[in-house]
């Protein structure tokens, strides 16, 4: 089958990606889900950062830098003032921040994420039942609204998409990550137990309606 509502332009190399980003309308990128682990993915990330695009990095985009995470951090810090959000889970987090793993006692999750954000120069969102978000300037928040049935394959990819959508609308990185996590959890609550990732996109409109109603905004 085919999903004809989605427009697709294949990009196989960093050079092709750079050509695509020559169009300034592409202001925000997600790299990682399904990208594959390796230098090609690293090159795509460096290309997006070099083009100074807002960027959400997840999954393979994080693991690809496991051998030399400082390469990623240096690239982020040299990319100007564009928003960058890293969205690891506890398995991916130590691939970039090995000394901040939860295997080492004595540091809270909040402290670990704050340290990671300061080190890499990006907003870091460490997923889990108590998803923790921190900015390089020390701001941090913990989201506690995620139901247990949100732990399902592909749910993190949906979260990356929500955050990228907010970044594309001009929402700053820390706020986009915080709002995105809350909306993600609420969409899971709307869907109920037994959800699959695709259900989250179906229930997001109900979350939007609740927000609009609370704010008294017509839609």
For every predicted segment, state its role:
Residues 186-219:
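Charged C-terminal helix
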Residues 109-117, 173-186, 197-205:
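Short, well-structured alpha-helical segments that form the helix of a local strand-helix-strand
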Residues 95-98, 152-183:
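Short, small-residue alpha-helix embedded
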Residues 28, 32-34, 152, 160, ...:
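Alpha-helical transmembrane segments in multi-pass membrane proteins
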Residues 101-102, 168, 189-192:
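Amphipathic alpha-helical interaction elements
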Residues 1-144, 212-219:
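Glycine-rich phosphate/dinucleotide-binding loop and adjoining beta-alpha-beta core of small-molecule
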Residues 148-150:
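Glycine-rich phosphate/pyrophosphate-binding beta-alpha loops
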């Amino acid at each position: 089958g085919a999903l004809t509502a989605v427009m697709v332009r294949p990009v196989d190399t960093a050079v092709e990606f750079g050509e695509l980003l020559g169009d300034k309308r592409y202001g925000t990128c997600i790299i990682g889900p399904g990208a594959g682990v390796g230098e090609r993915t690293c090159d795509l990330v460096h290309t997006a950062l070099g083009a100074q695009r807002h960027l959400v990095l997840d999954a393979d985009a994080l693991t690809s830098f496991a051998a030399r995470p400082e390469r990623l951090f240096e690239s982020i810090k040299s990319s100007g003032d564009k928003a960058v959000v890293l969205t690891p889970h506890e398995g991916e987090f130590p691939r970039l921040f090995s000394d901040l793993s939860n295997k080492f006692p004595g540091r809270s999750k909040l402290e670990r994420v704050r340290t990671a954000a300061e080190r890499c120069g990006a907003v870091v969102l460490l997923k889990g039942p108590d998803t923790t978000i921190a900015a390089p300037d020390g701001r941090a928040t913990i989201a506690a609204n995620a139901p247990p049935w949100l732990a399902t394959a592909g749910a993190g990819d949906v979260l990356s998409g929500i955050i990228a959508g907010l970044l594309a609308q001009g929402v700053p990185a820390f706020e986009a990550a915080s709002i995105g996590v809350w909306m993600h959890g609420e969409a899971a609550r709307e869907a109920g137990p037994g959800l699959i990732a695709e259900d989250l996109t179906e229930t997001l409109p109900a979350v939007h309606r609740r927000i609009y109603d609370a704010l008294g905004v017509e839609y």
